[in-house]
Regions:
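Positively charged, polyanion-binding regions of nucleic-acid-associated proteins
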Residues: 2-25, 30, 48
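Eukaryotic low-complexity, proline/serine- and acidic-rich intrinsically disordered regions
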Residues: 4-7, 59-64, 75
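Short, cationic-aromatic polyanion-contact patches
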Residues: 64-82
Length: 82
């Protein structure tokens, strides 16, 4: 899979698992993404896909690297879909 395709799949999963915040942006907790069975099967390297999506300004989250357990409560915010 190429990175752009994985980023698009990630966007779909954020929309599926997340909910709108006060600004109307879709938000999901990192722990929810990480523990979801479908995401686990889709993404061999979820953290790498998240970093690629952040670099391309599709999403935002606090920090540079998200780790399971430590960062489960960090919000992943969808900024754009295309």
């Amino acid at each position: 899979m190429n990175v752009d395709h994985e980023v698009q799949l990630l966007i779909q999963e954020i929309k599926r698992l997340g909910s709108p915040n006060a600004d109307g942006q879709i938000v999901v907790k990192f722990g929810v993404l990480f523990s979801d069975d479908k995401c686990a099967n889709l993404f061999e390297a979820l953290v790498g896909t998240l970093r690629a999506a952040k670099r391309k300004k599709f999403i935002k989250y606090d920090g540079e690297l998200l780790l399971q357990g430590v960062h489960d409560s960090v919000d992943v915010v969808l900024l754009k879909e295309e």
